[in-house]
């Protein structure tokens, strides 16, 4: 990395489905802000994506689409490293070493996200169970100081800290202990059809989310059909008015207007007016975002991925070499 005095930030997105407004507001805008203060490494975590079955041709295209999304959101490859996880073999090597030298079955049995995703299915892959250890390897390879994640990933970063501390204790100091960074507002943009559930690319209904590739017309319809709460007052109260609160947060983040200002502006007005104005704001955003998104051609995206891997590959290899020396297998 260019500036060794800056702290290092690492995060990533799976190319496993459509990226949506929740990803943009909850993660990508935060990353864009961070790249001016930190050495930022943003990964397309394709090995994580294949923990559930993917159609190969679709996966290949989605990898490029994730990078386009990064770029359209404002992540600048001159400031941040963007790379594909599978391009650097040290990720899977370190994951295996951590499996053997630091991780315990008891650790993984506590992971709530696996329980949520797997349910009682016996056909679930071992990779999905072991996902948090690969995530730990992703983070630890680059001497990461901070990991911006959603609330559903906090437990995995805590496991990363545990594995790093355990390895350092048993074999000698190698890993930096990373900290979790959670955005205060917008960390969880909720579903338009059910404000009790997070906006998610794996939702059973497309009414749950606004995809960043939705046509503006489709997005407007989704906003207008979004569920609301009983009563008519437009007030931010996540417990009593979760649906309206979610719309207010979305509006606030997109338009750069405080929630207090929005509440004052909609005093005496109805939900219909709020949704109409929010729909217009979303429409303007999507038109601008998609213009940038479609401007990045495949060859340019592949070059950015290669340049990123070339830049940080040596860091990963140096960490892995140090780990192997400590283990006596180098």
Tell me what each language-model feature is.
Residues 113-167, 171, 191:
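Internal, conserved structured core segments that host functional sites
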Residues 23, 155, 161-330:
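Conserved nucleotide- and phosphate/pyrophosphate-binding catalytic cores
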Residues 13-15, 46-48, 145-146, 203, ...:
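Short, histidine-centered active-site or binding-site loop motifs used for metal coordination
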Residues 2-137, 286, 291:
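N-terminal Rossmann-like or analogous alpha/beta NTP/dinucleotide-binding catalytic cores
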Residues 55-56, 146-150, 234:
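Short, polar/flexible loop-turn hinges at active-site or ligand-entry regions and domain interfaces
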Residues 102-109, 141-148, 252-262:
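Short helix-capping/linker segments at secondary-structure and domain boundaries
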Residues 81-84, 148, 231:
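Short catalytic-loop micro-motif centered on adjacent basic/acidic residues
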